[in-house]
């Protein structure tokens, strides 16, 4: 996790890894009405993060963006366990495909 400046940091891995698997848990949601400043700020952050990682997505041999994460916003730290569980379950479903793609 590269935080705000480089949220999908593949550069440290390129010289030492044969294959790179990137995972994004901050998908861009559809624009809906902004009922609060928090909703607006969340949308702006997601758009900024997407623009920030776009170049590095192309460098990933496997790119995973688990579905179902659009219901969570960046400011809901209390949902970290649920977000982890969604990503873990989705990735387990991809294990055979990843093996075929990489080996």
Model-flagged regions — what are they?
Residues 2-103:
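Patatin-like phospholipase
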């Amino acid at each position: 996790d590269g935080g705000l400046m480089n949220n999908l940091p593949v550069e440290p891995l390129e010289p030492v890894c044969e294959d790179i698997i990137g995972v994004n848990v901050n998908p861009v949601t559809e624009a809906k009405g902004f009922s609060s400043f928090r909703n607006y700020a969340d949308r702006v952050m997601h758009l900024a993060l997407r623009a920030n990682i776009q170049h590095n997505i192309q460098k990933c041999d496997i790119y995973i963006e688990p579905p179902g994460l659009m219901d969570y916003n960046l400011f809901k730290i209390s949902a970290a366990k649920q977000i982890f569980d969604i990503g873990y379950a989705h990735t387990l479903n991809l294990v055979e495909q990843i093996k075929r793609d990489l080996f």
